[in-house]
Amino acid sequence: MPQNTRHTSIVEMLSTPPQLPNSTDLNSLSEQTDKNTEANKSDTESLHKSISKSSSSSSLSTLDNTEYSNNNGNSLSTLNSQNLLSVHRQEWQHTPLSNLVEQNKLIFIRGSISVEEAFNTLVKHQLTSLPVENFPGDMNCLTFDYNDLNAYLLLVLNRIKVSNDKITSDCQNGKSVPVGEIVKLTPKNPFYKLPETENLSTVIGILGSGVHRVAITNVEMTQIKGILSQRRLIKYLWENARSFPNLKPLLDSSLEELNIGVLNAARDKPTFKQSRVISIQGDEHLIMALHKMYVERISSIAVVDPQGNLIGNISVTDVKHVTRTSQYPLLHNTCRHFVSVILNLRGLETGKDSFPIFHVYPTSSLARTFAKLVATKSHRLWIVQPNDNQPTASSEKSSSPSPSTPPVTTLPSLASSYHSNTQSSRMANSPVLKSSDTSNNKINVNINLSGPSPSQPQSPSATMPPPQSPSNCPASPTPAHFEKEYRTGKLIGVVSLTDILSVLARKQTHHKEIDPQMARKQRGHIG
């Protein structure tokens, strides 16, 4: 029997920022830069030169979608972006916002279109948010994102109350609801706008306060040219980190040294510089996780076992997997079950069983945290304390972690729950949730609506109901494999994009007192 081999994941190998070209290329680049500077001194600050893809085999590359893979071969897709492949002569704070504009990803939608159309546009273009215009050229847009879709779903199911009775009635009676009305239901920060001539020194103070995205305009501030999100900025800084020597001391520091995240379970309350750890038990229903994310105004939630060990992650973007009536039983199944379903769906999309690593340790370096945030495309990572029988994470700052093999336990019974006729009717009537042929969202999850037959009880270790056909629903990850990858240690903290950006902001003299929770307070925390 051939021995199974485990390929080291790219996230494990990536402890340092992407390489810059070799010294010969840098010298050549510097000489050319000096010539250009003499020719046009007024452009010195923003001067940069794109690196040719063929200049060196060690050229800077962009990590667009890196996943932990358990099959023979790393799940890695590399996308080189012209805007990111550049070397800057100045410190990162002086980088103009024009360097980060991606006009091809700027897509507006009208406030009059339905939530269904808005959702399909998100999926079609693989975006996480869309500016909603009340009229062409609107400069004061609200944005539609998956938090709004989650609110819509909860409203359809009568899980939340809003002041607009007409919207409530239309949602629950299956009528089309304008997306412009739905985006008003979720508290949002002001629509910040900055001209493309501003630099990162300015925007870091805004994004570091918890604002998720900023509009980049032309110099006259009469036209929006792009949207700069927290995630995009983190990605840019990571992929150009070697061009910014002043980042190195921070990247080499551990989360514990930087005091990022809630690192002591005994603390009653986090400090103003820290995010609260919000989690849900794995045996609680998925609908409770979605409701908790809505109430807490968060975009992802940790899934833990009764002992507080991290076993998974649910993001608000995962709500796209429960937008059809055939997927309704997932809402009343467990969060643990849903995590296994998500992994299975990723396998359908990529052809590989994937296990994204959403955790770090207190001893993890900021560089490693950057790498994992970029690789998982997440807004936060969970900080865990390794189990006693796991290898210590003390080497994370300087070397790749060793794969751990904690004890394997079986999952509890995950029989599908029965659902009420009233809620089932609401799901069926919803314009978004009733569609089973949406061209841009064809995700099939075969669920036994009536639950297991009494004469044929489910296996205690099952993670998904038996598929109707092997061709349309491949087997989900086995319980052993699932537990092996996710039983990472006790959840003790969380580090978010906001936490990291606020640290960068506070390193500047004029942002010393920045509060990473400011924007969240403006949005209005509930509960």
Curated annotation (Swiss-Prot):
InterPro entries linked to this entry: AMPK_gamma/SDS23_families (IPR050511), CBS_dom (IPR000644), CBS_dom_sf (IPR046342), Ssd23 (IPR016711)
Sites bearing Phosphoserine, chain numbering: 9, 42, 46, 430
Compositionally biased tracts (Basic and acidic residues): 32-48
Family as reported in the entry's similarity comment: Belongs to the SDS23 family.
Domain CBS: 101-162, 185-243, 272-330, 335-391
Function of the protein: Involved in DNA replication and cell separation during budding.
Biased composition (Polar residues): 21-31, 418-449
One cellular-component annotation, GO: cytoplasm
Protein name per the record: Protein SDS23
Note in the entry: Present with 21200 molecules/cell in log phase SD medium.
Keywords: CBS domain, Cytoplasm, Nucleus, Phosphoprotein, Repeat
Organism annotation: Saccharomyces cerevisiae (strain ATCC 204508 / S288c) (Baker's yeast)
Region (Disordered) location: 1-75, 385-481
Subcellular location as annotated: Cytoplasm; Nucleus
Gene3D superfamilies xrefs: CBS-domain
UniProt cross-references to SMART domains, sorted A to Z: CBS (SM00116)
One BP term from GO: regulation of mitotic metaphase/anaphase transition
Single Gene Ontology MF annotation: protein serine/threonine phosphatase inhibitor activity
Biased composition (Low complexity): 52-61, 391-417, 450-462
